[in-house]
Design a protein with these regions (language model features):
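Internal alpha-helical scaffold of NAD(P)-dependent oxidoreductase catalytic cores
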Residues: 30, 163-174, 179-244
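Rossmann-like NAD(P)(H) cofactor-binding subdomain of soluble oxidoreductases
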Residues: 120-182
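Conserved hydrophobic helix-helix packing surfaces used for dimerization/oligomerization
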Residues: 38-40, 148, 193
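Short glycine-/small-residue-rich Rossmann-like dinucleotide-binding loops
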Residues: 116-118, 153, 199
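A short, aliphatic-rich alpha-helical micro-motif
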Residues: 33, 103-107, 188
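NAD(P)+-binding Rossmann beta1-loop-alpha1 motif at the extreme N-terminus of oxidoreductases
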Residues: 30-77
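A structured beta-alpha segment of the ubiquitous adenosine-cofactor-binding alpha/beta core
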Residues: 85-110
C-alpha cells in the first residue's frame, strides 16, 4: 500500500495540548500500569530501542521476520549497532523476549508499538506503508482491543486514513526523534515526548497519556516536555523535524 503525503496549509492553526505533570500514573481499562504488556513490531533502531527502554519495567515481546535477529535478541545480543542497546541487553535485567510469531505476541499485549519500515520513494512521492498495515491487520485478527501506537515514519494524514480504512479507533501515533546508533540514548534522554490521539475520545486520550507514562518511566531524564495532541499535529511535528 502506498500513501501519498498530505500537506497542511496553515501551520498557525495547530492546537497543542500539554500533558500536565501528575503524581499518579494514568490507567487504562486494562491491566494495572505495572503489569502492562507491550509488543513491538520491528527491531530496527526505532523498535529495538523502544523495546529495550520499556523492558526495564514491563514485559516486552519484540517481533521480527528475520530469524537471525530474533535468535540474537534471545541471546542478549543486539542485531544492530547501538552502544547503549548492547550494554543494556548484556547488563540489565530486561523482561524482553523476541519472536517470529507476531500473532501470538500481539494476542496478549495491551500496547502494540508499530516500528515497521516505511520507505519513501522521492521519485514517486509516496511512502510504502504496506508493512505497517500488515501489522495492523494481524493485530486486528489476534487482539482488536490492543492499543496500536505507530512509531514508523508516516505522511501527514496517514493515521486518520488508516483508522478509517480499518474502521478501528485503537490506533494512535507517536513520532520518534532518534539518531541511528544512538537511539536508546535518545530514548533515555528524550528532547520531548509527543503522542497524537483523538482529542475527542476520552479513552484514547487516557491511552496516549499511559503510553507517554511508559516512555517517561523508562527514561533517565526527568521533567521531560510531554505533549498530547491531534494526529495531524503530531505527524506534522515529525515532518518539521525531518525537514529542519
Amino acid at each position: 500500500m502506498a500513501f501519498r503525503p498530505l500537506y497542511i496549509g496553515d501551520w498557525k492553526e495547530f492546537r497543542v495540548f500539554t500533558l500536565i505533570n501528575k503524581q499518579n500514573q494514568t490507567f487504562l481499562n486494562m491491566r494495572d500500569f505495572k503489569d502492562i504488556k507491550v509488543a513491538v513490531a520491528g527491531t530496527g533502531y526505532v523498535g529495538l530501542s523502544i523495546a529495550t527502554l520499556l523492558a526495564q519495567h514491563h514485559h516486552v515481546t519484540a517481533v521480527d521476520v528475520i530469524p537471525e535477529k530474533v535468535e540474537k535478541l534471545n541471546n542478549k545480543i543486539s542485531p544492530i549497532q547501538d552502544d547503549y542497546i548492547e550494554k543494556y541487553l548484556a547488563e540489565k535485567p530486561l523482561n524482553l523476549v523476541a519472536t517470529l510469531n507476531g500473532k501470538s505476541a500481539y494476542a496478549d499485549a495491551d500496547f502494540v508499538v508499530i516500528a515497521a519500515p516505511t520507505n519513501y520513494d522521492s521519485k514517486k512521492n509516496f511512502f510504502d506503508t504496506s508493512a505497517v498495515e500488515a501489522v495492523i491487520e494481524l493485530v486486528l485478527q489476534s487482539n482488536p482491543n490492543a492499543i496500536m501506537v505507530i512509531k514508523s515514519t508516516i505522511p501527514v494524514g496517514y493515521t486518520a486514513y488508516v483508522r478509517k480504512k480499518y474502521n478501528c479507533s485503537n490506533i494512535i501515533f507517536s513520532p520518534e526523534f532518534l539518531r541511528e546508533s544512538k537511539a536508546l540514548y535518545d530514548n533515555l534522554y528524550p528532547s520531548r515526548i509527543i503522542v497524537g490521539t483523538d482529542m475527542e475520545d476520552e479513552r484514547l486520550v487516557k491511552a496516549a497519556n499511559s503510553f507517554a507514562d511508559l516512555l517517561k518511566e523508562g527514561a533517565i531524564k526527568e521533567d521531560i516536555n510531554t505533549l498530547i495532541m491531534g494526529f495531524t499535529e503530531a505527524e506534522a511535528v515529525k515532518l518539521f523535524a525531518n525537514t529542519y
